Amino acid sequence: MRRLLLNCAVTASLAAPLQAQADREADLLRQLSEAETPEAARRVESELDALWSQSGSAAVDLLLKRGQDALEAGDPEAAIGHLTAALDHAPGFAAARVARAAAYYATNRIGPALDDLREALLLNPNHTEALTGFAVLLEEMGREEGALELFRRVQAMDPQDEAVAEAVRRLAVRLEGTAL
């Protein structure tokens, strides 16, 4: 009996931080959808990015940061190396998959980019950057209906994102015609 109670206590102590993170994510996504200005939306996006960039391992978080820094410095090959190392240790880390997809895209490796975005969305279906990246790739591949659907989904989540709004307008006109 004592062992059962100990197991329950350990399980509860491990589940509490996960629930707190899920609650925080839900609150931030609500704030993002209700943001009244682009500036407010960007602040919430930054908080979401910070939340999603926490793997639970300082070493994996450092590899993510190094990968992002390498990508920003114009070295996508180094980024792929760092991010692949992060994913070797934490294959369920959606933020690392999204970042590696961007690095693959920068090196014209569209197949691996799509694979990483697909996996990221299975792990975190609310990841706006993954949704947007997938929509961009679909549009580039001529799959405009799918791209429009994803852009509209992102627009519902982040109505202040002007680039997404422009993509929705552009694709809607092309696919649905102009409104009278």
Regions found by a protein language model. Give the residues of each.
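Positively charged n-region of N-terminal signal peptides that target proteins for export
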Residues: 1-4
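Bacterial N-terminal signal peptides
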Residues: 7-15
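N-terminal leader/linker segments that initiate helical-solenoid repeat arrays
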Residues: 18-65
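Terminal, low-structured helical/coil segments at or just beyond the last alpha-helical repeat
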Residues: 34, 43-44, 50-54, 149, ...
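Alpha-helical adaptor scaffolds
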Residues: 57-129
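Register position in tetratricopeptide repeats
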Residues: 72, 106, 140-141, 173-177
